[in-house]
């Protein structure tokens, strides 16, 4: 079954012939290779490009590596990258004329000196270069510097709920329940049956993500790293930092792990796109607060598999889904903080902080969003909108609930919508 990824395909099509290296990043198995080597490849063919002018090469494919005299097993044994000279010789053998050639290169981070190789291809007028990569440290964080302003990133996520519903055989209510449980990794979505989906997710975690992270970063104490993943999985959407996590290890695991080691492991997880962090932002002071942060999983199915599907908290899971959707749509997402001073019943002034779940920015557009699993009564609604009423600016304020409600604005101009409309209609918060 073909899964439509039009949102990302359109991004690639618009970037053709722009003189930049198109870099598709994202967690492994989110669909980058399928997007590049199937959907985009067939777009090129359907638009008159000859197959011999499309050069596809996957650096994690034993068959492709054989073509250039390399061995995947040997590379992994020796813990080294792929010889760039052998690869460039292969490309030269494929370029037979001055016509436009499209290079579709998969898992580019496995190639030694890939930055220099790609920059070299950019100097050729007849090459349009598209690559994928699964390591943020090698790609996302360095695109601007390594490619001297000539890198153009398209970050890809697992299936959004809207993409998921295109292949799900059921209504949106049951669909969201399954999506929040098993996530949107394409190969998992296409599996039949709960047991198969769960097994696939657990296998992905152990055989792909953990293995990649430990090998790439040469982690010696794999047990500590996995324990940290378990702690993060049990506390999605909770404020934390390396020092707090160190204390958790000390109390629960009787471990002497340092906060510096925990910080390093958190970086590894973010670099592999397994998790993302949201910083706190002082809305009144207009300044970022360095720590603590909130961490969200790029795929809820992976998070649930990590804790063996034992701890399914609808409130935090819904918050994670909303966060991922906002990031997929291109917003930067922070956690809003509003310092306030209030008098208690004895007249004593106390200082506290109100929280806005998400402060979303894209260019000059900003939204303040609260995730409220349910709004059973007016008391709960007032509680959810309380932080909004302390914000002095005119940016739109939105409450997203799982309750099936029609969109409405209250007397304060605050929009309430249901999560189904939010996830299935990308323009609903603009209306």
Give the residues covered by each predicted segment.
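Pre-Walker A adenine-sensing motif
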Residues: 1-19
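A cross-kingdom feature that marks ATP-driven nucleic-acid transaction machinery
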Residues: 2, 25, 29, 33-34, ...
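Interdomain hinge/linker elements that couple catalytic modules in large macromolecular machines
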Residues: 2, 157, 162-339, 351
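Hydrophobic positions on the alpha1 helix immediately C-terminal to the Walker A/P-loop
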Residues: 35, 39
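Conserved catalytic segments around the Walker B and adjacent sensor/switch elements
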Residues: 45-61
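Short glycine-rich substrate-engagement loop in P-loop NTPases that contacts/grips substrate
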Residues: 57-99
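Structural recognition of the conserved hydrophobic beta-strand(s) that form the central parallel beta-sheet
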Residues: 104, 128-134, 155
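Short regulatory helix/loop adjacent to the ATP-binding pocket of P-loop NTPases
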Residues: 120, 137-153, 167-169
């Amino acid at each position: 079954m073909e899964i439509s990824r039009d949102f990302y395909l359109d991004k690639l099509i618009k970037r053709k012939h722009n003189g930049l290296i198109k870099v598709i990043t994202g967690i492994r198995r989110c669909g980058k290779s399928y997007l590049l080597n199937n959907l985009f490849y067939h777009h090129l063919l359907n638009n008159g490009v000859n197959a011999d002018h499309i050069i596809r090469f996957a650096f994690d494919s034993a068959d492709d590596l054989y073509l250039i005299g390399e061995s995947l097993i040997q590379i992994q044994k020796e813990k080294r990258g792929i010889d760039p000279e052998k690869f460039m010789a292969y490309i030269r053998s494929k370029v037979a004329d001055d016509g436009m050639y499209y290079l579709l290169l998969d898992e580019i981070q496995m190639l030694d000196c890939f930055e220099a190789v790609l920059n070299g291809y950019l100097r050729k007028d007849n090459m349009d270069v598209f690559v994928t990569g699964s390591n943020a440290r090698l790609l996302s964080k360095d695109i601007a510097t390594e490619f001297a302003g000539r890198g153009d990133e398209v970050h890809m996520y697992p299936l959004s709920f809207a993409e998921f519903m295109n292949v799900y055989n059921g209504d949106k209510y049951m669909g969201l329940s399954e999506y929040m449980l098993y996530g949107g990794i394409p190969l998992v979505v296409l599996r039949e049956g709960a047991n198969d989906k769960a097994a696939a997710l657990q296998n992905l975690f152990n055989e792909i993500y953990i293995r990649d992270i430990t090998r790439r970063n040469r982690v010696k104490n794999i047990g500590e790293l996995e324990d940290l993943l378990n702690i993060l999985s049990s506390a999605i959407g909770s404020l934390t930092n390396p020092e707090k996590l160190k204390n958790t290890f000390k109390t629960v695991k009787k471990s002497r792990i340092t906060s510096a080691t925990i910080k390093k492991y958190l970086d590894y997880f973010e670099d592999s796109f397994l998790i993302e962090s949201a910083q706190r932002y002082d809305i009144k002071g207009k300044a970022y607060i360095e720590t603590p942060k909130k961490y969200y999983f790029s795929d809820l199915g992976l998070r649930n598999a990590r804790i063996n599907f034992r701890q399914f908290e609808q409130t935090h899971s819904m918050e994670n889904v909303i966060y991922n959707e906002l990031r997929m749509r291109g917003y930067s997402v922070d956690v809003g903080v509003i310092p306030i001073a209030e008098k208690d019943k004895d007249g004593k002034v106390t200082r506290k902080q109100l929280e806005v779940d998400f402060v979303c920015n894209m260019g000059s557009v900003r939204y303040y969003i609260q995730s409220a699993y349910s709004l059973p009564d007016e008391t709960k609604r007032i509680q959810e909108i309380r932080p909004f009423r302390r914000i002095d600016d005119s940016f739109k304020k939105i409450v997203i609930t799982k309750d099936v409600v029609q969109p409405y604005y209250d007397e304060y101009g605050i929009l309430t919508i249901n999560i189904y409309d939010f996830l299935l209609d990308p323009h609903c918060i603009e209306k």
